[in-house]
Structure formats: structure tokens, C-alpha cells
Amino acid sequence: MKILCIFLTFVFTVSCGPSVPQKKTREVAERKRECQLVRGACKPECNSWEYVYYYCNVNPCCAVWEYQKPIINKITSKLHQK
């Protein structure tokens, strides 16, 4: 009877989780979605103006470096008027 109880417990715990192919498919879809969030694309090779954000399944997620304007602090002098 104990063996039957242990066997049933094992069967129920194993059957409750997602199967390996379903889990892998879900992970790949999440990676592709994250790649799109950073405005990237999953493709075989990145161009020179792109960097590898991470890998979507087998191909890299290529994201474009964002151009940021340099911050220029203007130096202004105040003339004292008397």
C-alpha cells in the first residue's frame, strides 16, 4: 500500500509540470519578446553597428546602439553692471 501511495505521488508530481518541449518553446518565445522590447531582431549575424544583446534560441538578438547626443554645458559669464 505504501508503494502504491509513493507511486501515485510520483506520477501526480511529474504530470503536473509542463513538458520539456513546451517549456523550451515558451522560453524561446519569451526571449524573442524581450529582444523586440529592446528594439532588436533575432537573426543569424549582427552587423557592425549592432551588438549582441543575448541569444534567441540559436541566433543572436542584434540590437542597435542608441545614439545619444553629447551633453554640452554652455559656459555663460555674468557681467556685473554698476
UniProtKB/Swiss-Prot annotation:
Q: InterPro entries, per this entry? A: Beta_defensin_dom (IPR025933)
S-S pairs: 35-61, 42-56, 46-62
Q: Which UniProt keywords apply?
A: Antibiotic, Antimicrobial, Defensin, Disulfide bond, Secreted, Signal
Biological process annotations from GO:
defense response to bacterium; innate immune response
Q: Where is the signal peptide?
A: 1-16
Q: Which family does it belong to?
A: Belongs to the beta-defensin family.
Q: What is this protein called?
A: Beta-defensin 113
Q: Which organism is it from?
A: Homo sapiens
